[in-house]
């Protein structure tokens, strides 16, 4: 049963027609032909054996991620801790979420809210990057009155440091402001894709996020696809046609030359 639940997003993705998913008591969400629910792309749940616990000094509360993510997370947090411009300490929190955890998160809001309203704060289960084990939320301590996972994160020096440096450690911001995906701006939510495709584990992460990266670009992003600018077109001018000699003038010149030849004889 657990294995089947992990593959539910894939089954939804290949459905021929839109379906309705019952997520909470009295709340259903329409799943489009492209597999998206309320703007969110489908993702399967990471197998438990592919996740490891992050060291306690990296996170606020329990945090399980792919091991290759933790290696770069350690480097990022160490670099941030050594930079006084951060004005605090960065931590990870809310790392991997199972489908059941995501359902609990999605349904925890007020029962009066519609699925659309709920999706503003949380992705529907089966449609969260957190399920992959490659995504996490960042927070700062001391909090200074800014709750975790709130827009006030963007006003912190720590966020400005992330925006300038996170890509160097393989992290990119999934949901920038005014994103085409139609998902709420989340300055705290970052996914790992590796510093390059050749980095350990990066190829798999980039495969899982390929559609998101292609259709709904992260910003800041890791090695974004270069913009191909077509070469400037230099107009070429056709050579001017050669002027045809005027036959009348040629004959007159020929007659003059003939008279000159006869006089020389």
Where are these regions (language model features)?
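Sec-dependent N-terminal signal peptides
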Residues: 7-15
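Extracytoplasmic cell-surface/polysaccharide-interacting catalytic and binding patches
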Residues: 18-95, 99-265
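N-terminal secretory signal peptides that target proteins for export/translocation
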Residues: 1-4
């Amino acid at each position: 049963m657990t294995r089947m639940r992990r593959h539910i997003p894939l089954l939804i993705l290949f459905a021929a027609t839109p379906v309705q998913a019952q997520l909470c008591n009295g709340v259903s969400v329409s799943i489009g032909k492209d597999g998206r629910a309320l703007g969110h792309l489908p993702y399967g749940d990471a197998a438990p054996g592919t996740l490891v616990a992050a060291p306690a000094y990296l996170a606020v509360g329990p945090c399980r991620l792919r091991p290759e993510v933790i290696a770069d997370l350690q480097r990022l947090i160490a670099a941030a801790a050594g930079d006084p411009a951060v004005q605090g300490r960065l931590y990870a929190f809310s790392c991997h979420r199972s489908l059941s955890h995501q359902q609990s998160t999605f349904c925890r809001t007020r029962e009066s809210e519609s699925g659309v309203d709920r999706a503003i704060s949380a992705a529907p289960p089966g449609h969260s990057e957190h399920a992959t084990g490659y995504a996490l939320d960042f927070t700062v301590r001391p909090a200074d009155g800014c709750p975790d996972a709130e827009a006030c994160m963007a006003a912190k020096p720590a966020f400005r440091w992330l925006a300038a440096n996170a890509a160097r450690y393989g992290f990119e911001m999934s949901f920038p402001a005014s994103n085409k995906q139609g998902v709420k701006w989340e300055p705290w939510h970052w996914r790992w894709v590796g510093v390059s495709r050749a980095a350990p584990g990066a190829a798999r992460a980039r495969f899982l996020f390929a559609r998101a990266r292609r259709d709904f670009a992260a910003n800041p992003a890791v090695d974004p696809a270069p913009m191909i600018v077509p070469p400037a077109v230099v107009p070429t001018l056709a050579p001017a046609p050669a002027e045809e000699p005027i036959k009348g003038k040629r004959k007159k010149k020929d007659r003059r030359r003939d008279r000159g030849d006869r006089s020389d004889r």
